């Protein structure tokens, strides 16, 4: 069986970090680095992302099993888990399906609910960039950014997305498997099973300016994660760990050291 790509920093109690859609293990580097002073930080590339294997299936029970396979490979019996966005859903699914592996759970700006499709322009833009790279109409990151700007207005979002571009033997290509992600997108937006629950310590961290977690979601969250609490980072959007890194890391450390 294929194993996800992972990176280990530091020593101590294991802490597993799981990135969001179109990301890679590097995206949580600003969390991994300081946490590695006190923890064995295991950063994961989700399938179809980063340097991990490609598969045309991204349902959450399977994505959770992928991470558990890494822990089994490393002989890690229990860990703290932190996931952002899609990675938060994967971390929640691990807690729901494999609770004995989970010492505690930290979920960054996502709820276990179904979300409406809202990445279509991003997917379309990235696929157009990929097509023009294949046709050798795009040969530089600058050209890729210019084309993507017709689909994605915000420069920082484009910069994040284009971190997926890499060069091998002088040829640009995407590390993430765009077609699989596009095919599996409905699965990624799905809710987790509301009939499952995890009674362990759980922290939800919400960006104050983000609408990914709302007050109404507590009606779904509480029965599934009865021992959960929430922290809000004022002024932070969905990318709360990147926008307010010091505040985010303090909340994480305080929770882990409780």
What annotation goes with each model-predicted range?
Residues 135-192:
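Conserved alpha/beta-hydrolase catalytic His-Asp/Glu region
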Residues 62-79:
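Conserved acidic catalytic loop of the alpha/beta-hydrolase fold
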Residues 236-245, 249:
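Catalytic histidine-centered segment of alpha/beta-hydrolase-like enzymes
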Residues 170-224, 229-232:
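Conserved serine/cysteine hydrolase catalytic core
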